[in-house]
Amino acid sequence: IRAVSPMTAEDYCAGGCTALLDAIGRTVSKLAGVQRNTAEEYRAEKVMFVIITDGEENASREYSSQKVKSMIRREQEQYGWEFIFLGANIDAGETAAQFGISADRAVDYVPDGAGTALNFQAISETAALFRSAAPMPQAPLAAIRRDMKRRGRRR
C-alpha cells in the first residue's frame, strides 16, 4: 500500500469515454510484473483484482477484449488470482464474461452514492474474508445484488 502513489488530475480525467480494456490491461500487466519481480517472501499470497466501472468500453487503443481475457485467464489459472467485476449502466455479467470473469463474480450496481458506498463496503468485507478463507466469499457481493434488485438502475 505504501508504494501506491496518490491519484492526480493527470491520472484520472472524467470525459465521457471509458477505456476499460486499457485500464484493465495496464493494471493487470503492472501488478503481474510487480508480483513476479518481488522476492517470494514479500510477494502477495493472494490477489483479488476488483474492476468497478459505470460505462461500456468505448475508447481503448492498446488492449483488445481477447488480449485482456487471455491475461486474466493466465493470472487465474497460473497464480490463482480472483477477479470481481462491478458494473453500472451496463450488463455486468455479459461484460465480465467477455473478459473471462465468471458470472458469480460479476455484479450490477446502482450508480448513486448509496450504491457506490455499498460497493466499497462489500469489497472491504470480501477482502477481509478472502484473506482468511480459502474459497472466494460470495455473501458480501449478494448485498449489492439485493440492492440492485430492490432499487433498480439509477442514473
Where on the chain are the PLM-derived regions?
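Acidic, low-complexity intrinsically disordered regions
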Residues: 1-155
